[in-house]
Curated annotation (Swiss-Prot):
Name by which UniProt lists this protein: Small ribosomal subunit protein uS11
GO CC terms of this entry: ribonucleoprotein complex; ribosome
Organism: Caulobacter vibrioides (strain NA1000 / CB15N) (Caulobacter crescentus)
Keyword terms, alphabetized: Ribonucleoprotein, Ribosomal protein, RNA-binding, rRNA-binding
Superkingdom as given in the UniProt entry: Bacteria
Single GO MF annotation: structural constituent of ribosome
Coiled coil: none
Self-association and partners: Part of the 30S ribosomal subunit. Interacts with proteins S7 and S18. Binds to IF-3.
NCBIfam families according to UniProt: PRK05309.1, uS11_bact
Sequence similarity: Belongs to the universal ribosomal protein uS11 family.
Xref: InterPro entries: Ribosomal_uS11, Ribosomal_uS11_bac-type, Ribosomal_uS11_CS, Ribosomal_uS11_sf
GO biological process: translation
């Protein structure tokens, strides 16, 4: 009794013309998620997913590669215009924006949604190198 091979469900092509790109640029990695207006994920990518490891994940080039990848995947679903929400203090913020434009997306608005504490938790102590 041989088990029949599992059928791989193909991703159906969504016809969405506009979306929201969430760029999360931390000190260690850059993650780009492209969603529709309701927040359902269309495509996503990160610097680590592109094969960068360790401290190379936090570079602007890694963020550029991740944004290009997420933009190409979203373009397959018909996304042409994007609103961009940028979050975090990382070095890949601007390069991710430029890469999304280079991937053929029209950027309508850019919003900085970095959470700023109203004197919340104590930050980690300064590094002494």
């Amino acid at each position: 009794m041989a088990k029949e091979p599992a059928r791989v469900k193909r991703r159906e092509r969504k016809n969405i013309t506009s979306g929201v790109a969430h760029v999360n640029a931390s000190f260690n990695n850059t993650m780009i998620t492209i969603t529709d207006a309701q927040g359902n994920t269309i495509s996503w990518s990160s610097a680590g997913m592109m094969g960068f490891k360790g401290s190379r994940k936090s570079t602007p080039y890694a963020a550029q590669m991740a944004a290009e990848d997420a933009g190409k995947k979203a373009a397959e679903h018909g996304v042409k215009t994007l609103e961009v929400n940028v979050s975090g203090p990382g070095s890949g913020r601007e390069s991710a924006l430029r890469a999304l434009q280079a991937a053929g997306m029209t950027i309508t608005t850019i919003r900085d949604v970095t959470p700023i504490p109203h004197n919340g938790c104590r930050p980690p102590k300064r590094r002494r190198v």
